[in-house]
Amino acid sequence: MEIVVIGAGLAGVEAANVISKFGIKVKLFEMKPKKFSPAHKIDNFAELVCSNSLKSKLLTNASGLLKEEMKVFGSLVMEAAEATSVEAGQALAVDRYKFSEYITQRIKHNGLISIIHEEVTEVPRDKVVVVSTGPLTTESLLSDISKLCNSKNLYFFDAAAPIVLKDSIDFSKAFFASRYNKGSNDYINCPMTKEEYERFYWELVNAEVIEVKDFEKDLLFEGCMPIEEMARRGIDTMRYGPLKPVGIIDPRTGKMPYAVVQLRKDTQDGKLYNMVGFQTRLKWSEQKRVFRLIPGLENAEFVRYGVMHKNSYINSPEVLTKYLFLKKYPNIFFAGQITGVEGYLESASTGIIAGINAARQILGKEPISLPPNTCIGALIEYITTPKKDFQPMNANYGIISIDDEISKIKDKEKRKLLIAQKSLNICRELANKIFE
């Protein structure tokens, strides 16, 4: 018995890991280091190419619930994240290099997983396969996937934020603080006056960008929108988004700044910080010029500039079942961002479910699905339910089904905690049956 997993990103490593728990051999194909996508830089598996944050740990946030659900199913990604975490207040952020290394070593030392470093250009039709090649799937494989799905792929863009060397930040202007003084002071804050903000705004919206094709310009996903695109929506849009000053007091003035740029720790040793919300497609020379207008970053050393890259995903509502296998080819499963889920953990969670169902299929068992009153179940239902305009979706309480009794509770936090409690009970019950 053997299952093929194509792609060793977050979804792929989860699929391979969970399949091995059933005693089934896995052939894991990963084209790195022989070939890299435009956004990937390191040899290791499960590389984080956008932010190093895995979002909130709180159960009142859907991302917090998703984490707990994944842990119930023995998530390797969550195990690695907790082992390589960096301080980030109420969020779970990781040292991206240690995180990828942790996962890579776990996969390499799993006796049931064979790793083949080759590019796959065709999906095998005669094997049980999990396709988890991500949003930067190669053109040759996309062409074959398009034949499999009998539909055109959809395209959108992600943007990665720049990373700055902490020692190059001017702390006579920048300062450490958390919003409303909640949690530890994990963020570096660069305060702006109205004049400084407006100058930055005008330079940003007029800066040179790396051009994209006309038909692709409107396909930016809101969750990772380039800062310059956000700025073009209005002069104050950034001040109500990533540059919002509320809850921050400048120790120099004792007052709330007009705007604040925040930087979050990117590595455990605290040497590198990423610019929160500053995903961008500005040319590198323009990033250096414009972002150095931010107070405290006048001499900033950028160890990585922001990059813009194409993401591709299948039209899941048309071609995928709630068990994550193709309607036309039940032996071929899809997982990760290529299915239209958006986000690190969202991708990883679908890898777990696809892996479980691939294993169950080869063992002659019925596939499982989580109900829509769980976070994972709601995500999968969203991407597999037919809709007129299918767009990527990340974890949020808005897509989770609730019963009438819970819906009557007016206190939002109490309501979310009850939803989370019920969801986790369902997950535990199912996990006990699956892994008994």
UniProtKB/Swiss-Prot annotation:
Query: Which one of the record's GO molecular function terms can you name?
Result: tRNA (uracil(54)-C5)-methyltransferase activity, 5,10-methylenetetrahydrofolate-dependent
Task: Name the residues that bind FAD.
Answer: G7, A8, G9, L10, A11, G12
What EC designation does it have?
Answer: 2.1.1.74
The record's subcellular locations are: Cytoplasm
Q: Which reaction does this enzyme catalyse, per its entry?
A: uridine(54) in tRNA + (6R)-5,10-methylene-5,6,7,8-tetrahydrofolate + NADH + H(+) = 5-methyluridine(54) in tRNA + (6S)-5,6,7,8-tetrahydrofolate + NAD(+); uridine(54) in tRNA + (6R)-5,10-methylene-5,6,7,8-tetrahydrofolate + NADPH + H(+) = 5-methyluridine(54) in tRNA + (6S)-5,6,7,8-tetrahydrofolate + NADP(+)
One GO BP? tRNA wobble uridine modification
What's the cofactor?
A: FAD
Purpose: Catalyzes the folate-dependent formation of 5-methyl-uridine at position 54 (M-5-U54) in all tRNAs.
Q: Which family does it belong to?
A: Belongs to the MnmG family. TrmFO subfamily.
HAMAP family per record: TrmFO (MF_01037)
**Could you tell me what this protein is called?**
Methylenetetrahydrofolate--tRNA-(uracil-5-)-methyltransferase TrmFO
Q: Which organism is it from?
A: Caldicellulosiruptor bescii (strain ATCC BAA-1888 / DSM 6725 / KCTC 15123 / Z-1320) (Anaerocellum thermophilum)
Taxonomy of origin reads:
Bacteria, Bacillati, Bacillota, Bacillota incertae sedis, Caldicellulosiruptorales
